[in-house]
Amino acid sequence: MTHIRKALAVFAAALSVTTLCTGVATAGEDSAKAVLRYTEHGIPHIVAKDYAGLGYGYGYASATDNVCELAKIYVTVSAQRSRYFGPDGEGYPSLSEAKNNLHSDLFFQQINDSGVVDGLVAQPAPQGPRPEVRQIVSGYVKGFNAYLARTGRSGITDPACRGADWVRPISEQDFYRHYYSIAVTGGLGFVTEGLFAAPPSGAPSPAPGTPAQLSASLRDGLGKGGLGSNGIAVGADGTAAGRGSVLLGNPHYPWHDGRRFWQSQLTIPGRVDVAGASLLGMPFVMIGHTADAAWTHTVSTPVTFGLFEVPLAPGDPTTYVVDGKPEKMTSREVTVQVRQADGSLKPARQTFWSTRYGPVLNDVGGFPVPWTAKSAYALRDANATNMRGLNTWFELDQARSTADVVRALKSTQGVPWVNTIATDRAGNALYADIQVVPHVTDSQAAACSTPAGQQTLAADGLAILDGSRSSCQWGSDPDALEPGIFGPSRLPQQQRRDYELNANDSAWLSNARAPLTGFPRIVSDQDSERSPRTREALLAAEASKFTTDSMKKLLFADHSLFADLAAADLAKLCASFPGGQAPSSSGPVPVGPACDALASWDHRYTLDSRGSLLFQRFAARLGNVDRFTVPFDPKAPLTTPNTLNAGDAGVQKAFGDALVELRAAGLPPDARLRDGQAVTRNGERIPIHGAQGFLGVLNVMTPVWDPARGNAEVAHGSSFVQVVGFSGRGCPDSSTLLTYSQSANPASPYFSDQTKLYSRGEWVKGRFCEADILRSPALRIVVLR
């Protein structure tokens, strides 16, 4: 083995080894395209001599682990789900909110027919991909196709697509369509069902919803109630050593389908060396670190689309009026092929309507915005012309400092809907929400908002503007790369030496000692209640001096701030019920050991915590109940609101209903978390620690409740987790976990190995530097030629 390691060290410097080939040989090519060096848990360290080779290695390795998941993505963005799976099956929620395959296909077909993706790709940088990005993408496509050519459909080991005719070689167009779908996830992808709007036929239109209902739809649909992330950047003054930095990256993302992360290290000697993870099919590191800088992303609060209400011409619902002049809507009929019960194909057609602002719609995340004889609503997605994010992550992958991170964000302006939190070896901590945001100033909103828009902007940052006036179109900034978005100078950023963090609230309290204020409402609110999870992170940052080990312990402490605020009072309420009977929706229910379990609970969601399941189900049932007696105070944002409103009938009933729910699932009130929260992989039950974000738990796990068994699966939660420390001149001190593991293939050894690690509270040692990679006891080499 020693001579192999020496040869690999030479290869890392010169990329000339050919004697260790265990991969794919391609006739006529004498040198390796890439070398994959696998370490523990199937993590590939991909080395190539150029960007095309780097993409090739990524494409081949990612297909090896997840060919079926990737094939699902490509059949979706090519609008062929109905052709292969029929029209009625569930759409692909990773990429749109389409309710079924047919609507998914029609949605993506109208994007494809519009030519928008091809047009953006054809542009030079900065609007289109820079040359190096094009080389990476070209290599990625060839690498994916090389894997498929080697295995063949019948050789795929994953039963999800073994032998399936919908698994096929891909093109660069497939790749760019996939990226575009990611960019518009928070806009066009969120309102997919609403785009199936038709001119009024004379039948009564559905009643419009209230602004409060729209706010609820936005919070649920855009993920603010579940999907999200934590990012904590600790600078030198916040570390125990007083130098260097520590970063926690902890995105809370789906455990299934196309929004899974996949981990790798990408190296071109002397040019790029970066480790971390990316969404499936993206041959860059999107969250990770270089030798001197580390970064993560968190889902941000700005709503990246806006609505325009347009008046219609009398008697013509497809003509609208701007500045007193009529304009015809444009229409596009799209056609997709649909598999019938007998296996034959028949066409299905749909007409989509559009205005100067964007497509006409009649629904926003389940909230009706009717197209009537008098008015219609059009949507503008600020990311609809954004192909720049690929350039952003290319540049982030070469960052050596937080200054480089800011430079990458400002020069590319491609981040679609996330904050960036970063650290560097010099001891800096950065928060930046330099992303695509609709250019709607407060003064413009005051002059142009509709009555509903006045409420939705204040509550959730959604602008609904008067489309009858061209002066109400989105504005622009001199430093913006395209009209209609804010330039970087107008967006929040802050660098400090103690800490910066975000847990999916606005920019206001990225540091409790240095609030970020004065931004347009659409960019960031201020003086507003912070989530329990944000408060948990801020309180920890204010009270601690961090090491990498203490940061890992903070995350896996699974501590619940909401439990600190309410559990003791809930235990007292439990003990106060007459006759030991709590009220519930189905009548009185005995409290049994519930009171003692809550009173002795440590307020954590570790596997052996008793009382945690009961409190979780109680909190999940509170809904809009007025739960606290002490309201939010903007002068005390870390400690308010507080004190459980134990006298409220809704609070009492939620407790009783939680008891009933546990009993129906066969779980006693004092059950351990491990008894009622687990996933099953290849027949093995794996207990899962953590809990929902609304409980103020940093290590978010959003489980799927089975009434007969308890929490039986994870919908989304902690996914790719990294803790990265810099100190002195040595290698980055990194630990990672991919909670659902590298592969979605149940036949892979990397299907659930890291899930078991996560269950035990263990981490994967980061192997970034050459010596660490070569010391891996699991080292396995694949040379791709």
Predicted feature descriptions by range:
Residues 1-27:
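Secretory targeting and sorting signals
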Residues 268-280, 288-293, 297-462, 491:
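Glycine- and hydrophobic-rich flexible loops that cap the catalytic core of alpha/beta enzyme folds
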Residues 133-143, 257, 389, 404-408, ...:
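Stable alpha-helical elements in mature extracytoplasmic
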Residues 175, 201-206, 431, 439-446, ...:
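A terminal-accessory region detector
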Residues 305, 375, 415-540, 619-624:
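Hydrophobic alpha-helical segments
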Residues 65-126, 528-608:
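Long, charged, mostly alpha-helical binding arms that flank functional sites
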Residues 508-591, 675-785:
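Terminal end segments
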Residues 30-246, 251-257, 269-271, 276-278, ...:
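Substrate-recognition/specificity elements adjacent to catalytic centers across diverse enzyme folds
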